[in-house]
Amino acid sequence: MTVSVVVPVKDEAENVAALAREIAAALKAEPAHEILFVDDGSTDGTAAALAALKKEIPHFRPLRHDRNLGQSRGIRTGVRAATGEIIVTLDGDGQNDPADIPALLKTLRADPELGLVSGVRVKRKDTASRRVASRLGNRFRDAMLRDGAADTGCGLKVFYRDAFLDLPYFNHMHRYLIALVQREGWKVAYVPVNHRPRLAGRSKYTNLGRMLVSVTDLLGVRWLQRRHGGRTKIEEL
């Protein structure tokens, strides 16, 4: 199966080249693969940096939104444009380690009942305030969704393209992929992964900003959980 790596980025001109090269190195054992970076309306030199990488990295496909639409839309744009049956996503700031991709792919391929494999960050390199906010947010989320998510904020995930496109789309949906995939009747597995300091630049998110949107999103996902019966086998008679 072809593997498509999808990386949404916003104002990451200093990070994209190094990250793209690391991803290409991690995929050397994959005979059929492609790398898609989705520039979500950057206002720095991200678009130019991505265009330059087309000459350097085989199977590299940069895409660009004409305005900022958010991380979930960036992922969805990449998945819809992808030709691979298996999708890998990771954040564009370099904190996810591409060297962990093969382990997640191996786990997904080992069990046909799995729809998604998520990384679980070990020894996180975030600030203390972000770690505390994440811990509290995860507890509240688990109380609401009961999805057993081991690390909701890890951007490194592997899943089937068709499974993703079956999910209801909404802004910030990338934070709830585990619950949404389970809602469709798939199993989810977890793999410990490395976590690194940001390569360059600053985060686009704040703890308060995440909290404000999370309450509404959690209520929406809980509503969705109660109104779906999961996968079914369809037979033509």
What function would you assign to each model-found segment?
Residues 33-36, 47-81:
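Conserved donor nucleotide-binding strand/loop of the catalytic core
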Residues 14-18, 44-53:
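Acidic helix N-cap motif at the loop->helix transition within catalytic regions
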